[in-house]
Amino acid sequence: QVTEAGASDKAGTFVKFKPDASIFITTEYKYSILATRMRELAFLNKGITIILTDRRHLNEDGSYQTEIFHSEEGLKEFVKFIDSNREPLVDNIIYINTEKNDIPVEVAIMYNTSFNENVYSYVNNINTIEGGTHLTGFRRGLTRTLKSYAEKTGLLSKLKFDINGDDFREGLTAVISVKVQEPQFEGQTKTKLGNNEVVSAVDQAVSTMLEYYLEENPKDAKSIVNKVILAATARHAARKARELVQRKTVLTGGGLPGKLADCSEKDPAQCEIFFVEGDSAGGTAKQGRDRRFQAVMPLRGKILNVEKALVHKVFD
């Protein structure tokens, strides 16, 4: 029963929770985990103030350990906090705050000079560590918009190989927050969003705002696209090196001598191999061959003409 206690300028609710030892294995709270969660909530709900106080232990001065979490810029400050130890690629933060298909969508994007992708996604303030449809929509909108801009401006004209979605997300830090009335959670730990309608909502929100940002900030856009090209080039070079090692492993594993000068063509039907007598002839043949499809292998000793030789000579 609620009774009137008198006039007050304060309002709110106290919620007390004590873990049941018969259900929970551990009943002692870890301050660091609670602090991380309170900080997240302050970033996700800009303007609110959260005070965390640990009254289990007293400090030397007789006070309790206390932290105050407050953010005026929300997700913008969140990505700055995540990237605090990284060098930014561009100074501006790409910020999106809109509503698509009755779904509020808020996204903050920042590129840095590292090679890692750091994307955090939330639904109704719940950390969806397994991702879900909102993350799918974000990646789709980001990749399509950046690729379209790069092709339209001719920045990809000299690239001789394709780029993929991973290249666009190298050095990317982003926070995605959506509000869904009836969220459907999937996955083993129920931390993956399954609402299909969220894909198009986030996709549209990201592509619309990102397209506008790229047009208004051509210098930043060029830096981001150049970062993408660098990532694609590194990935392509790594794949080539890996294939070369695998190819050499196959050849050496098959018992072929190390003196074989292989060709670069992978299709056996398009390749030729020349067996030459001795290292001297092998060196001359290597200089005159087309290394794209012609391989040369020097043989030790004199080659026997089996058509004219006696049978016992052939098998000697």
Question: Model features per residue range: what roles?
Answer:
Residues 1-315:
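GHKL-family ATPase ATP-binding module
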